[in-house]
Structure formats: structure tokens, C-alpha cells
């Protein structure tokens, strides 16, 4: 991650580097006015193959900004492979989550190493399998990756093949809340459970619903 919003003193701006390509998101009007300059600076510093604008954030509408998905410099392939810790991961910058991949969780994925060996792992809200693949590579006996998106699970399976762990990674397409209740009723047990749900509260008005969701 090249720029991480407030953490780097640039609220509303995220810039991620995937192999030799960059992807960015702008969430506020102030930085939108500096977009062309931003692209010029990124191109000068990194000399990337391409830079992709992933400005399809719903929050942009609150600032009167359009939804944009476009290559704004060079060329960006439909898919590319990145290296994250011991894993290789397929990334689709144009249609993947956020800027193409949840890079903000890469440190946590690396922290699975001492906990995964020999365990049966349940990865809830797995998206494209970042946690699942790392758990398998770190020696998990089995990994069940669960997500409501079959498109995301298809990428989990491809990532499992890419990393040589397809024999220990299975996928389940289901609503996580429903499946968790079902598994609890069945008395299923896992040595390691990972849950990385989407944001429940994207605005103050959603707080009550978020509290209910987290409790559930």
C-alpha cells in the first residue's frame, strides 16, 4: 500500500501497488481536484506499466462526484499475479474489491503462520481467499472458504490451484449468518475460525444495524 488515507496524512486517498501496476481511489472533492497531478506524480515516481482509477465508491456520490473505473495511464491487464508473504494471488484491478485486493489485511494474513498448522480452518467472508490460501500454505489440515459471492469463490479456487493447495481448500457459497447458525446447531468445531466481514456501518445512521450484525 503506497498511500493509506488518514494514516499517511491524505484523507480520502488510497493508492495500492500490484506488481508493476498502480490502482487508486479518491473519496473526497478536495483530492479529486488534484487527480491529474496525482497521476503525474505516481507515474514519475514508480514508472508503472499502468495506473487504474477505481473511483466507484458510493461515498463519492455524497460529494457530487461521478463513479469512474478507467485506466488513466499506460495499460493495466485484466488480471495479474502478486506475491504476498508465501502466497501468489490473482488480482483483478478493474473488478476486484476496493482497489483490486484487500492489501490492508496483508499483515494479518501473515500472522496466521503460528496458528494454522494442523488445524481445520473456517474462513468466513473469505472474498478471493487471502486468508484461506495463507492458512493452507502455513500447514492447515483443511480450509473451508465461505462467501456469498460465487464469483469470489471461483477466484479462491483458482488461487488454491495457483499455490498448489487445492486438495485442502474447499469453497461454500452461502450467507455467512445463516451458515454460522447451521454449523453451530450441528455442533461443528474448527481449530481456527477467521471472520473478515464487510463494513456494517458506513454511516452514523447504520450504527444500530451494525451493533446487531456484530452481536449475531
Describe each model-derived feature in a short phrase.
Residues 3-16, 32-101, 110:
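Non-catalytic substrate-recognition/targeting regions of SAM-dependent transferases
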Residues 74-216:
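Rossmann-like S-adenosyl-L-methionine
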Residues 23-32:
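Short histidine-centered catalytic/ligand-binding loop motif
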Residues 26, 55, 147:
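Short beta-strand/turn micro-motifs composed of small residues
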Amino acid at each position: 500500500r503506497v498511500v493509506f488515507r488518514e494514516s499517511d496524512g491524505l484523507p480520502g486517498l488510497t493508492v495500492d501497488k500490484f506488481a508493476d501496476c498502480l490502482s487508486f481511489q479518491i473519496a473526497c472533492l478536495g483530492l479529486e481536484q488534484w487527480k491529474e497531478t496525482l497521476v503525474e506524480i505516481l507515474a514519475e515516481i514508480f514508472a508503472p506499466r499502468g495506473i487504474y482509477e477505481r473511483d466507484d465508491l458510493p461515498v463519492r456520490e455524497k460529494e457530487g462526484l461521478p463513479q469512474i473505473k478507467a485506466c488513466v495511464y499506460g495499460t493495466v491487464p485484466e488480471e495479474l499475479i502478486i506475491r504476498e508473504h508465501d502466497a501468489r494471488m490473482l488480482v483483478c484491478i478493474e473488478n476486484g474489491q476496493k482497489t483490486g485486493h484487500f492489501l490492508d489485511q496483508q499483515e494479518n494474513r501473515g500472522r496466521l503462520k503460528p496458528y494454522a498448522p494442523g488445524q481445520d480452518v473456517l474462513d468466513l467472508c473469505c472474498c478471493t481467499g487471502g486468508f484461506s490460501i495463507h492458512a493452507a500454505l502455513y500447514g492447515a489440515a483443511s480450509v473451508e472458504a465461505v462467501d456469498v459471492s460465487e464469483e469470489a469463490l471461483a477466484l479462491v479456487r483458482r488461487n488454491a490451484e495457483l499455490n498448489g493447495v487445492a486438495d485442502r481448500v474447499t469453497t461454500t457459497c452461502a450467507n455467512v449468518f445463516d451458515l454460522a447458525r447451521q454449523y453451530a446447531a450441528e455442533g461443528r468445531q474448527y481449530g481456527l475460525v477467521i471472520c473478515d466481514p464487510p463494513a456494517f456501518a458506513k454511516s452514523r445512521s447504520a450504527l444500530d444495524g451494525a451493533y446487531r450484525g456484530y452481536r449475531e
